[in-house]
Amino acid sequence: MTDLTQLQAGLIGRIEAAADVAALEAIRVEALGKSGSISEMLKGLGKMSPDERREQGPKINGLRDAVATAIAEKKAALEAAELDRKLAAERVDLTLPPPPERRGRVHPTMQVLDEMIAVFAEMGFGLAEGPDIEDDFHNFTALNFPPKHPAREMHDTFWLPQNEAGERKLLRTHTSPVQVRVMRGTNEKLPAWIANGQAPPIRVIVPGRVYRSDSDATHTPMFHQLEGLVIDRNIHMGHLKWTLETFTRRFFEAEGVVTRFRPHHFPFTEPSCEMDVQCDRSGGSVKIGQGSDWLEILGGGMVHPNVLRNCGLDPDEWQGFAFGLGVDRLGMLKYGMPDLRDMFGSDVRWLEHWGFSAFQAPNPATGLS
């Protein structure tokens, strides 16, 4: 049998002299591989007599363990030396600027909505909210919509299937149902955050999502609306006119905006009107406060006596006005966005272009400036 001590010394010497991991792996295969010299010795133990196995077995196993330990230690030393070499060769320039951070942008709808809330907060308006899923009474009946009014039809309103009680809910077509909830006050058996009930005088705005079965470049099935409601004694159209003109000048940040009011019809107001602003439509864009064209931007009027009665208020004692405007549409006009549908897309590039820095967010306590 091969002199085990001499074999061990030779293998340990070669292991220590190995220059890299590849050379070390070759020695391991030669000694400990499937057909390696030490592996063959271990296989030969089966052919020995019991006395020879008892004598040679521990020696061969000791040789195998010594060689395996030497290989593992040498491999760790070679890998550490290679890492030190790479680290010594690398250079980090601490003066290089870091890669730019991608900051989030405030969506134009949220920016415009915050701007509107800030303007109305300056005029003393509070905030009210209501549910997106409404019933016929709050969305139509209480607001003086006749039973056969076109707005009740399927092509204008998203109706939900009947429930077990035979009632049909709908996605609200405007934020006006919150007017009813505010004026009815404690008569509404709803949580306080939905009911928003309060006794007159009332001065609130109601921002929120509304839903109509319509879709083109200037209409979407879901959009954002802001409703305004004032209830007090001796309220008249002059108060409505001042409120809307003041809002328009502050929102568009143009003192020279010219407005006009045209008679219109809404079931829930009487008299009713629409407000136009003077603008310039030349050049493929709309510029508010310039030119000689006119553009309708909102509607309003005096709260209809029937609506007041439906909400438990005496129209001989209380009067009020209401108005509604499209948040997304006014944002398009103010900032020149061409297609309303883009505001409901998911293109991050569009948001990076049209979005706002969080530092530009208006504050209801301080207004737009």
Curated annotation (Swiss-Prot):
Binding site for Mg(2+): 270
Enzyme class, spelled out: ligase
GO BP terms, alphabetized: phenylalanyl-tRNA aminoacylation
Matches recorded under Gene3D superfamilies: Bira Bifunctional Protein, Domain 2
InterPro entries assigned to the protein according to its UniProt record, in alphabetical order: aa-tRNA-synth_II, aa-tRNA-synth_II/BPL/LPL, Phe-tRNA-synth_IIc_asu, Phe-tRNA_ligase_II_N, Phe_tRNA_ligase_alpha1_bac, Phenylalanyl-tRNA_Synthase, tRNA-bd_arm
Note on cofactor: Binds 2 magnesium ions per tetramer.
GO MF term list: ATP binding; magnesium ion binding; phenylalanine-tRNA ligase activity; tRNA binding
Subcellular location: Cytoplasm
UniProtKB keywords: Aminoacyl-tRNA synthetase, ATP-binding, Cytoplasm, Ligase, Magnesium, Metal-binding, Nucleotide-binding, Protein biosynthesis
Family: Belongs to the class-II aminoacyl-tRNA synthetase family. Phe-tRNA synthetase alpha subunit type 1 subfamily.
Database matches in PANTHER family: PHENYLALANINE--TRNA LIGASE, MITOCHONDRIAL, PHENYLALANYL-TRNA SYNTHETASE
This protein's name: Phenylalanine--tRNA ligase alpha subunit
Gene this chain is encoded by: pheS
